[in-house]
Amino acid sequence: MKIELSMQPWNPGYSSEGATAQETYTCPKMIEMEQAEAQLAELDLLASMFPGENELIVNDQLAVAELKDCIEKKTMEGRSSKVYFTINMNLDVSDEKMAMFSLACILPFKYPAVLPEITVRSVLLSRSQQTQLNTDLTAFLQKHCHGDVCILNATEWVREHASGYVSRDTSSSPTTGSTVQSVDLIFTRLWIYSHHIYNKCKRKNILEWAKELSLSGFSMPGKPGVVCVEGPQSACEEFWSRLRKLNWKRILIRHREDIPFDGTNDETERQRKFSIFEEKVFSVNGARGNHMDFGQLYQFLNTKGCGDVFQMFFGVEGQ
C-alpha cells in the first residue's frame, strides 16, 4: 500500500536487527532546507494519524526543536541531532489476540533523500523473527521509497505483514508468567536534561519520587543537570509529570527509550541498566563547585552500557 504525503511541491528535483538506512538512494535536486521541511511536515502528519496517548512518542524533543528553529531561520547551522520518535501500534496477530508493535524511527539529516533508520520490536517476536521482519522491511523500503517520505508506508507494511512473523506456537500460548494483556506493557528509560540542578529540595524530590515509583537510574546535580529514570512506562510518565511541574530554567526529555516487554519481574530486571536510583556527584570543576567532571560521567555511563547517550546529550564524543 503506497501512501503519498500531501504537501506543497518542492522545487524540481539502535540496532543490528533494525531496518537501518543505507545512504543508497539519493535525491540530488532536493536541498537541505527542503529535506528539513519534508521531515517536519511528515512528523506533523504522523501526529494527526497517531493521536492516541503513547501512539506517537518523540524520543528526542530537542532534535525537533532544533529542526523547527533551523527551518524558521532558514539555515541548517546549529542542527546537531537527528529526529527520533517511536510509533506504537496494537495489531491483530490472531483471531483472539492483539499485540503491540513498536517502530523506532530515526530520520537522517538528508532524509527523505536517504532512507530512514527503522527498528520494529514486539515481545511476541523471537530474535530471529524480529531480524527477518526488519530485513524484509528494509527491502520493501529500498524497492518502493526512492527519495520519498515513507514512515506511513512502513507502518502500513508492518500492519499488513506483522502477524506472518509471529509463529503459531508463540501466538497461541501466552509468555510464561504473563497474561494476554501483558504484551501491551512498555519498559521506558527517560534521559532528562536540565539547565542546572542545584536546589536541595528538588534533589530530594528526585530521589524520593524515584524510590516511591520503584524506578532505577541516577541524577547528576550541577550545571547542566542530568536525570535518568527507568522502569514501567506509567511510572516513568508519572515521575516526569511531577518533575516538569517544578520551577526550572530549562528542562526536557533529551532521549527516550521505549521497549515492549512481558511485564514479568524477571524481564523488568533484565531490561534495567541500573540496579538502584542514586545521586551521582563526580569530581567537580570550577570555583563554585557546580560543574561536574564529564569524563567521569562518560566512564560511568560506559560501565552501564549507555556510553552512546553521552553524545546525544552533549553533542561530542565521550572520552
From Swiss-Prot:
Residues with PTM Phosphoserine: S275
Keywords: Phosphoprotein
Tissue expression pattern: Ubiquitous.
UniProt domain RWD: residue ranges: 41-165
Covalent S-S links between cysteines: none
SUPFAM superfamilies the UniProt entry points to: UBC-like
InterPro entries registered for this protein in UniProt: Phi-like, Prp3_C, RWD_dom, UBQ-conjugating_enzyme/RWD
Protein's recorded name: RWD domain-containing protein 2B
